[in-house]
Amino acid sequence: MRIEAKNLVKIYGDRCVVNDNSFYIDKGEVVCLLGPNGAGKTTTFYMIVGLVKPNSGEVFIDGTEITNWPMNLRAKAGIGYLPQENSIFRKLSVEDNIKLVLEMNEKLTVNEKKNKLEELLDEFGVTRLRKYPAVALSGGERRRVEIARALAASPDFMLLDEPFAGIDPIAIGEIKDNIRKISEEKGLGVLITDHNPKATLSITDRAYVIFDGKIKIQGKSVDVANDPVAKEFYLGKDFQL
């Protein structure tokens, strides 16, 4: 199963911010979109999410074109999305945040939903926090609950917008472990865009680097991390994984 973008173009006024970008994400792999500020990576990412419509080009999931589908239909097709902004329901408890999504999951029986709740609480290390109001969580705890809640919908793919933003180094390590686990053990495809290239490249299988609206470098993350052009224009000459 694959998400594929073909020849995406986005123009605002007289400026082409995304220029003919094509890429893909398969189930079971972690892929990232990277680039300097203003390069077009976020706009490219949002065209996969469904927040931005391209001027031209197409987006497919499992061979079905979804270019003009709204986000709710993309979710039903198996695409989960975690925004950078705080998306947790602050007045609800941790378990009620997850239950809310589980109750809408038509793929699971009542008993399966109960088991899934316990599984997600345990997997993301928040069982002891299950009765806590979400407003009382730290940044790292909140992010783990948000990922668990997104997984409650049983997606095939997860699109993560700035998953490492606003959390401390220890929490970043925990989130990295969670991302690898959902890819390797659950078989989900994961697409990440983030301003932390070291954390992102260290857990991704493949990377696309965008300059001036165009994908200029792509390949295995370890190769991209050592690419001289990527270091010159984005990563910095002393960058190391």
List the model feature ranges, each with a label.
Residues 34-36:
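The feature captures the beta-strand-to-loop junction immediately N-terminal to the Walker
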Residues 110-129, 180, 229:
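Conserved ABC ATPase "signature" region
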Residues 133-137, 141:
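Conserved ABC ATPase signature
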